Amino acid sequence: MRSRKLAGGVRSSARLRARSCSAASASAQDTHVTTSAQTACQTPSSHKATDRRTSKKFKYDKGHIVKSELQKHRSDSAATPSETPGTHEPLASAEDGASLLGKEAGGSTPQGTAGPLPGRCGTESDASPAETENEPLPPRHGAPVGGESNGGCPARDGAALDLEQGPGAPLLMDGSALLDDDSNQPMPVSRFFGNVELMQDLPPVSSSCPSMSRREFRKMHFRAKDDEEDDADGAET
């Protein structure tokens, strides 16, 4: 009886140990499963957190770039009006220099010709204040070679008369001015006989018969007429 009880006790203790081991293994498996589930849940949350951080950084970088560009544009726009007055300074200095040169040229001229002359002379003297004394201007087209007239001004009428009286273009022999059908002018000869200049250069034609007077020509004409009448009468008879 005692041996059976001991055997039953040993068996019961072994069973308890096996149960405790199985429970421990089950609890270990449960803890492992829970830890794996927690890690699995934590990984997407960490990914989401990193994605949010990157998106925030990207948005911040974008906003920073846009702000920097706007600041650059503002600085450029603020710098441009400050540069514009500087561009007018050389023009103003050039105008001042031209006025000073004009004053110096006016002061160097004699007192007799200090005032501007009427007409075109005043404009010409004002337009050329920067002319040097050593370099004279070239003569203008149509101006007289002898110099200036009427107190230093080139005479327009004299130049026009010189142009009119001077050797003009050679006259054309085609008579293009006389081609109007409604006009009473005669037709040009060159339209029918070619170049008239070649015809004028030809020597005169020598007459084979000797020159006769007007009376002799009339006598011959009447004689020929009488002969024709006699021939006509003879033919009728």
Curated annotation (Swiss-Prot):
Region (Disordered): 1-187
Biased composition, class Polar residues, residue ranges: 29-47
InterPro entries: UPF0688 (IPR031530)
Ranges of compositional bias, category Low complexity: 11-28
Compartments (UniProt record): Nucleus
This protein's UniProt keywords: Nucleus, Phosphoprotein
Compositionally biased intervals (Basic and acidic residues): 48-76
Gene Ontology cellular component annotations, sorted alphabetically: nucleus
Modified-residue entries (Phosphoserine), positions: S183
Signal peptide: none
Similarity comment: family membership: Belongs to the UPF0688 family.
Name this protein carries in UniProt: UPF0688 protein C1orf174 homolog
Organism per entry: Bos taurus (Bovine)
